[in-house]
């Protein structure tokens, strides 16, 4: 059974669900899920949880996302991208200073209405399904945050502009194109969209479906991955970092055996001397590196695996309802909450043998 995360570089022309289906087939597994949805016409980072890692999806931070995209001015479409029908046109060609002035209104906390063709749920149904059936879709605007929005290229001949953006969760790039076009009175839609970051998942550490189909993805080696301290230690000649907490005391180094290849101390993929990249799985422990970890005994682990609550000493730093991960050695046991002095299992990992 494969358990861990995959930092997938999704190609264009494939939905997020289709990407997950292909990954299931490649790894021969039945359970997988993705963190955040990426439009079929978009490419880039789509983190995919495999096996028991699917239980960690709600606990992974994806508050920061990064995108590169191109807007074509002069046309607004039903889908706010190339795939829709044209509904409004304009002959206006916005100038460099006009665009730079307009994008200032899109930085910070803004109110944004998702596209009609989006995965937003309306009374239990996806908005895009309602829109495709011809129903009128009424999507409520919501507050989102844009940390950075820059125009990096303007082609006045072809009437297109390239942008880079760092934003919070829930932002629709297609809505940015739509609203910016309306602001400039020239209309606009997305022609290219690429996501380069989702939380800790970065573009330069990703893998493509083509790479996965060519390489052996189930070869193990004793290489190591990071957890969450600034303490460095060598493992098989590679500088790595990692530590775990034992009863709330960070006093031991924890080295995590992972698939060959592993990650570097900076989080990037490593390759063996022959350049044969064999392993792309990020262990559950590493994906949860920002979550507080507490080591427990095998006896305590068995109780938690059965859904029983336990009492642990020396958890004074935890507040009521704090979430943390219990581990035995380097093996995650469960995501737990600290409730009125008890350690209560929320999601138990079926990994420990």
UniProtKB/Swiss-Prot annotation:
InterPro entries: PsdUridine_synth_cat_dom_sf (IPR020103), PsdUridine_synth_N (IPR002501), tRNA_psdUridine_synth_TruB (IPR014780), TruB_C (IPR032819). The keyword Ion transport does not apply. GO terms for biological process: mRNA pseudouridine synthesis; tRNA pseudouridine synthesis. It is an enzyme of class 5 (isomerase). SUPFAM superfamilies: Pseudouridine synthase (SSF55120). Belongs to the pseudouridine synthase TruB family. Type 1 subfamily. PANTHER family: PSEUDOURIDYLATE SYNTHASE TRUB1 (PTHR13767:SF2), TRNA-PSEUDOURIDINE SYNTHASE (PTHR13767). This is tRNA pseudouridine synthase B. The gene is truB.
């Amino acid at each position: 059974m494969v358990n861990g995360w995959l930092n997938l570089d999704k190609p264009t022309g494939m939905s997020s669900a289709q990407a997950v289906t292909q990954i299931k087939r490649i790894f021969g597994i039945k359970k997988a899920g993705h963190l955040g949805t990426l439009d079929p016409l978009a490419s880039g980072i789509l983190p995919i949880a495999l096996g028991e890692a699917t239980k960690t999806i709600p606990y992974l931070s994806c508050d920061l996302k990064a995108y590169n995209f191109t807007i074509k001015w002069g046309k607004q479409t039903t889908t706010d991208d190339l795939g829709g029908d044209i509904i409004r046109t304009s002959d206006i060609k916005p100038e460099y200073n006009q665009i730079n002035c307009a994008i200032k209104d899109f930085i910070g906390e803004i109110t944004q209405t998702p596209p009609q063709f989006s995965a937003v749920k309306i009374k239990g149904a996806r908005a895009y399904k309602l829109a495709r059936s011809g129903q009128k879709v009424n999507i409520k605007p919501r507050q989102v945050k844009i940390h950075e929005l820059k125009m990096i290229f303007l082609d006045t001949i072809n009437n297109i502009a390239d942008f880079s953006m760092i934003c919070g969760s829930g932002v629709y790039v297609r809505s940015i194109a739509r609203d910016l076009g309306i602001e400039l009175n020239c209309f606009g839609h997305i022609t290219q969209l690429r996501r380069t970051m989702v939380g800790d998942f970065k573009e330069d550490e990703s893998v493509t479906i083509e790479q996965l189909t060519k390489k052996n993805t189930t070869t193990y080696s004793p290489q190591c991955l990071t957890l969450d301290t600034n303490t460095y230690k060598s493992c098989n000649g590679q500088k790595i970092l990692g530590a775990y907490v034992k009863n709330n005391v960070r006093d031991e180094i924890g080295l995590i055996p992972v698939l060959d290849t592993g990650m570097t101390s900076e989080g990037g993929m490593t390759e063996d001397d022959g350049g044969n990249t064999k392993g792309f799985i990020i262990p559950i422990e590493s994906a949860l590196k920002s979550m507080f970890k507490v080591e427990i005994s095998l006896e305590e682990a068995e109780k938690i695996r059965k859904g029983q609550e336990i009492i642990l000493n020396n958890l004074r730093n935890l507040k009521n309802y704090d979430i943390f991960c219990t581990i035995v050695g380097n093996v995650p046991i469960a995501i737990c909450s600290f409730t009125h002095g008890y350690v209560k299992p929320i999601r138990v990992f079926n990994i420990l043998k």
